[in-house]
Amino acid sequence: MTIELLTPFTKVELEPEIKEKKRKQVGILGGNFNPVHNAHLIVADQVRQQLGLDQVLLMPEYQPPHVDKKETIPEHHRLKMLELAIEGIDGLVIETIELERKGISYTYDTMKILTEKNPDTDYYFIIGADMVDYLPKWYRIDELVDMVQFVGVQRPRYKVGTSYPVIWVDVPLMDISSSMVRDFLAQGRKPNFLLPQPVLDYIEKEGLY
């Protein structure tokens, strides 16, 4: 039997007990989702793929600072439509923090909670090009840019510059909005192919809009 003696000059390589954990890369697409439509899903999926994110959270607002509260249907309907819209789609997940917190949904307050709760996660906050114009007016924006990386997506008729750090992602130009869907329904027109069929079925079943 051979015995190997270790001397003070013997180099011993030790396997690290704890390997550095890879940080999670998570996108967030907030919105009223009144109702959710196909452009929402395309934006979320394209940003996830193009930036190589682990997942994108679809985060419905409870009471947006910029939307008339009277025009927003109850949150349980908006949440159910989101659940129907993303069923079976990999990489898209619903985040209900703002519905649970209630009150006005300021992005700074939400991201402060999420970043403190998940210190191992890098967040990418997705906004339309039309919202980039308003970044200087966002609540506590200078602190918010230290918490998240903003991702701007191109929409029809909007192309802007900004002094804030924004990653731009090109997505298929689909000029669809929730207000367009609501207008179609108010006029008695079916918004076929503008939103997932299960969502449209739910709207008709519940008599929404």
UniProtKB/Swiss-Prot annotation:
UniProt cross-references to CDD domains, sorted A to Z: NMNAT (cd02165)
Keyword field contains Glycoprotein: no
Identification of the protein by name: Probable nicotinate-nucleotide adenylyltransferase
Family statement: Belongs to the NadD family.
Catalytic activity: nicotinate beta-D-ribonucleotide + ATP + H(+) = deamido-NAD(+) + diphosphate
NCBIfam families in the record: cyt_tran_rel, nicotinate (nicotinamide) nucleotide adenylyltransferase, PRK00071.1-3, PRK00071.1-4
Keyword annotations: ATP-binding, NAD, Nucleotide-binding, Nucleotidyltransferase, Pyridine nucleotide biosynthesis, Transferase
Gene: nadD
PANTHER family in the record: NICOTINATE-NUCLEOTIDE ADENYLYLTRANSFERASE-RELATED, PHOSPHOPANTETHEINE ADENYLYLTRANSFERASE
